[in-house]
């Protein structure tokens, strides 16, 4: 079931907006200022009908010229107050919205990046980006303007209603009878708008996820000449989002129209009754004029509430989706009272009866009764066919996952007893697929250790045989590598990864096909660099290259999540079996 197809939780309606409070609370001074200026501007607006009443009652004659001058001078003063209060109110609420949005995005991003690897395996990056972008913007629109319009309309409605009662209790009573008729469609239509808003946002997230996947795989799309096909797929996704948006817009339009017709129809009926009272001389014309203006204010406020109600429902839908992300909890966390590794870290590893299956494949064992001891400073190569469990061993060492049975010990300490930053801080990883970020060459190498000096970065690049190609780029170490390292070859990206590991200078080194993208000449140089890097460190190597495997102190052969043989290159060849077969197919051929 996709996110778009998932039913919205029935218990969550406007309650989802409560999640906004922690992001608004730190900026309470802006909220107080906004409320003060809201009250001031609303009060100034409600004064205007009083002046109109006096003008109508006193009439336009030479004898009343002085009074009229005073009234209009007072009106100008009210207008000045209204202008200042409105501008200040807009400033406060808009700034409040921007700050709340920044806090929301910052905390949401910080929460998401701390989730475990399993979460990202079952999530689509494009949808996560949509929630960080589109959904938070919808919420910002509510905080920055929607709430302002809603509360201003509510204050004006209450104020105008109170003044209507004060002006003419009889006419106000007739008006009060029609209010329930107006509120019913607002509530009924509003719930439907919320559901349609959520569906629309889910469809947009699906389209964003599709675009993200396609653009990230642009070379493959072009190689298979799928530009038109992918464009049509994206077009279909956009049309689905448009259909959902069209339904939402239509529902909001009907809501606004129904409310305006009902309210203004009722007000017209009440004013007709007031006009009859004026003709019967039971009501002054000035009083009716004053009541008319207050009724118009109240009607406008009701219309404003009906208009913004759709925004409120849309933001509630967006906040539900954001709340789902905040509700996610990392399955892999640091213990409440972590143990500290003994210093210096030696790098002794012990895998004790490890049993593990991936959450997405619960019926298939990735490792089964896996036992292995690695001595400090030993280099161990893991070899075996695809799916044997080699990369799983590295993933468990990094605590991307925890085994369902057994335990892994580092220097006699269970990995689950260590704080995650401490564990991962003593490990350097050179992955098969190197992540290059949109930054400079120096920044990408410094990813291995943020506080490294320029001299240390330069030394790491030299050791990884990366200095030459970096120096040849325009800008050298300050050259931008482009998103995902599009300006680098596969071998250059791997050398950046090796430089990171060298810079990290960790006691435990994990090499996952670290030289798979290198040509023979570059590999020879890198092998020397890796050999220097491995000295004095416990190293786990996954490789199919003969040179890498041969220099290992021990080779561990895996198949089906189990260890089937161990030994040196020569002894395993002499034994025959799986390793000899792999060597014949991959090394000799």
What is the role of each PLM region?
Residues 342-589:
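ABC-type nucleotide-binding domain
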Residues 26-29, 117-118, 134-143, 147, ...:
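An intracellular "coupling" helix at the cytosolic face of ABC transporter transmembrane type-1 domains
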Residues 3-13, 36-37, 44-57, 78-125, ...:
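Juxtamembrane helix-loop junctions of ABC transporter transmembrane domains
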Residues 1-46, 60-75, 89-93, 97, ...:
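Membrane-integrated ABC transporters
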Residues 18-21, 29-50, 54, 71, ...:
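Alpha-helical segments in transporter systems
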Residues 64, 70, 163-177, 247, ...:
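Helix-loop-helix
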Residues 26, 30-40, 81, 145-199, ...:
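Transmembrane helices of ABC transporter permease
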Residues 31-85, 92, 165-170, 268, ...:
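Transmembrane helix-loop-helix hairpins at lipid-water interfaces of multipass membrane proteins
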